[in-house]
Amino acid sequence: MQRTEDASLTRERPFEPKRTCLLLIDTQNYVWNPEVAKRVPYFDRQVREVVLPNLRRLIDAFHGARAEVMYTVIENYTRDGRDRSLDYKLSNFFIAKGSWEAKVLDAIAPGDDDIVLPKTSSGVFNSTNIEYLLRNIGIDTLVVTGFLTDQCVDHTVRDAADRGFYPVCLPDACATHSETRHESALKAFAGYCRTMTTAQLLAAIVAATR
C-alpha cells in the first residue's frame, strides 16, 4: 500500500526562488543563425517572435527574484572533439571550443554570474556536472526551456525527473523545426513534468516576491 505522504505529492508547487533554476538549453549561434533561418522558416519565426522575447522576460524575472539562471551549450572540450559522445561523432556535431557557434545568442546572453555548461551529449545530465551543481545550490525545481523541444529539451525533462527534480516545461519558451515535432514532443514527455506558460510562471514569480 502506498504511503500517505507519497500519495499527497504534486507537481503543482508554489514558486520558491531559492529552490528554482531557469535552464536554457542550447540557445546558441550553432542552433539558430541566418543559415538555419533560411532553411527552417517555421523555427526562425518561432524563435524570433515567441521564444526569445519570452526567454528575455524570464531571465530578467529570475535575476530580479535572485533565482538561478543556467545555460547549456553544445561545445567540444577539446580542439579535435575527441571528447564528444559517440552519437555526436556519428551525427557530425562538431562545435569547436570557444567558437562563435558555441556562444549563447546575444539577445539572451548570460549575466556575469550565470553558469554556462558546455555539453557533448544530448542529455545535459550525461556530460556535465549539472546535478552536482544543482544539489550544491539547493535547487529542486528545474524550469526547462530552449532548443530543440524534441531532442535536448526532451532528454533534460526526462532525466531531471528520474534524478528526483521537479521539472517544469514552458512550451512557449521552447522550439524545434516544426509545429508537429514540437507538439508531439510536449505530449510525449508531459507525464514527466509540470507544463506552464511563460505568463503563468512570471505571475508566480511576482506572487512569490511581493
What are these model-predicted stretches?
Residues V36-F43, R82-L86, A160:
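Surface-exposed, active-site-proximal loop segments in enzymatic domains
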Residues R66-V69, V73-N92:
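Early exported N-terminus immediately downstream of N-terminal targeting peptides
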Residues M1-C21, R57-A65, D87-R210:
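Active-site-adjacent betaalpha module
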Residues T27, I74-N76, D172:
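Active-site loop/turn elements of alpha/beta-hydrolase fold enzymes
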Residues C21-T27:
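N-terminal nucleotide-binding beta1-loop-alpha1 segment
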Residues K18-T20, V36-F62, R66-I74:
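A short alpha/beta connector and helix-capping loop motif
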